[in-house]
Amino acid sequence: MSDVFSGGERALFLDSKHRRYLVTLHPEGEFHSHSGFVPHADVIGRAPGVRLESTLGARYIVLRPTLEDFVLEMPRGAQVIYPKDLAPICVLADIGPGVRVYETGIGSGALSMTMLRWGATIRGVELREDFLNRATSNVRSFLGEQALERYRVTVGDSYESVPDGPYDRVVLDLPEPWQVVPHATSALAPGGILVAYTPSITQAVQTRQALDRQWTDVRTLEVLHRTWHIEGQSVRPDHRMVAHTAFLTAARFIGS
């Protein structure tokens, strides 16, 4: 990675109110807002952290976007899994370099990007081709063309089968994950891990009921994300928090 911004790269503009703007830099391009504009040429060739002013005097700090920044600001078709759940999913699934993952319900690719970033090789299935194309585009945009060598995705229905096993991990984000559990038992290697992301507790309950004696170490949790206000001697929880988004259910496959 270069020490300075270059054309074609994504940059994150932060204004004085901490609002974020994800921009793709072009030599002739301009970043426009209600507070004037900043030529992209003022960013290209400069190091991350550069401070700039717009034509109307608005101040910005320009940084390279993190994975979290990109997930929150990237183009999307489907609802994404948010960062507060992405990391716990990867920890529950024990994602790491070389791990073979079957992912279904790809959506806009937020979880795919996170697992690829952690080193996994992904075989993905998505019911809708427009979602699949969006996810592939987002992966390419943030991680680069080389990441696609570990990312094979096709249109299909995981309720019918889980193709091309064996896998080390099965990660599910779809309305009825319990329908995929029987297929996962024939696709997972012994000791493999299944993780299901379900917005409602009834979905989590039905998923748990589908996990029979071939599974162990079954657990369900949710992640509540609360930030804190710290300013001098004023220290308190922020008035708002990111509370429930989904239940995460994890289990280990031990076979019959």
What are these model-predicted stretches?
Residues 1-64:
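N-terminal auxiliary segments of SAM/dcSAM-dependent transferases
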Residues 96-107:
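Conserved class I S-adenosyl-L-methionine
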Residues 2-3, 72-87:
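Conserved SAM-binding loop and adjacent beta-strand
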Residues 125-177:
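S-adenosyl-L-methionine
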